[in-house]
Amino acid sequence: MEILPAIDLLDGACVRLHKGDYEQVTRFSDDPVAQALSWQQQGATRLHLVDLDGAKRGEPVNDSAVQAITSALDIPVQLGGGVRSLERAEQLLACGLDRVILGTVAIEQPDLVRSLAERYPGRIVVGIDAKDGRVATRGWIEQSDVLATDLARTFSSSGIAAIITTDIATDGTLAGPNLEALRTMAASSSVPVIASGGIGCMADLLSLLPLEPLGVSGVIVGRALYDGRVDLAEAVRALAEPRLQDITAVAADLA
């Protein structure tokens, strides 16, 4: 299972939001390039970027920081937040990003997502952010009536690389992942699922391992890394070489 360190960009700085609330911001670093290089040096195999300004406003704000990060790193970088047009997606892919993540546009213009997935195989990811099982859009500001699992099913045969599913209620809380929601999401789609939200310790990461055979292929971690609750190098080793006793113990707890 792949672990993806997250860098959330707001006004050019690395921050974290609590449950997606733009009024509850914790600032971790004013140098996102240095932070990205640190994650790479600690063993990250892919970096996850979120343009929070773009997600909220629907327009690019942090492009200079994104360009600097992709230029400095050797590992692939993916980005989401405010990618709501064909032109914007192609612009980002051309600037060195390995993957772009489409969230709001996936519910508003699903045909655009399919078109991009066909044009750029393996480089388009759908981000499904959910609260109480229903999709939230536009930087989590708006709540829809669409079930997250229904949206996932619509992209099962579209050619997208993965689905990133974020449980808004646990994001930034360190309270642990919503395992049942992840299990349901994985069962709803034939494409790999990447978990996001709630990771607070190594045990939380290990709790995801029984879901890997169901299709949960990766996990995004943010605040737990910045707070020092999870050591990235240790986490990379643990998820790359699952320890049978840990998986068995967690599986027993889930049963």
Curated annotation (Swiss-Prot):
CDD domains (alphabetical): HisA
Active site: 8 (proton acceptor), 129 (proton donor)
Assigned protein family: Belongs to the HisA/HisF family.
GO cellular component: cytoplasm
Gene Ontology biological-process annotations: L-histidine biosynthetic process; L-tryptophan biosynthetic process
GO molecular function per UniProt: 1-(5-phosphoribosyl)-5-[(5-phosphoribosylamino)methylideneamino]imidazole-4-carboxamide isomerase activity
UniProt enzyme class: isomerase
Domain of life: Bacteria
Name the UniProt record assigns to this protein: 1-(5-phosphoribosyl)-5-[(5-phosphoribosylamino)methylideneamino] imidazole-4-carboxamide isomerase
Keywords: Amino-acid biosynthesis, Cytoplasm, Histidine biosynthesis, Isomerase
Gene3D superfamilies for this protein: Aldolase class I
Main location group: cytoplasm
Catalyzed chemical reaction(s): 1-(5-phospho-beta-D-ribosyl)-5-[(5-phospho-beta-D-ribosylamino)methylideneamino]imidazole-4-carboxamide = 5-[(5-phospho-1-deoxy-D-ribulos-1-ylimino)methylamino]-1-(5-phospho-beta-D-ribosyl)imidazole-4-carboxamide
Pathway named in the protein's UniProt entry: Amino-acid biosynthesis; L-histidine biosynthesis; L-histidine from 5-phospho-alpha-D-ribose 1-diphosphate: step 4/9
One Pfam family hit: His_biosynth
Record EC number: 5.3.1.16
Entry's localization field: Cytoplasm
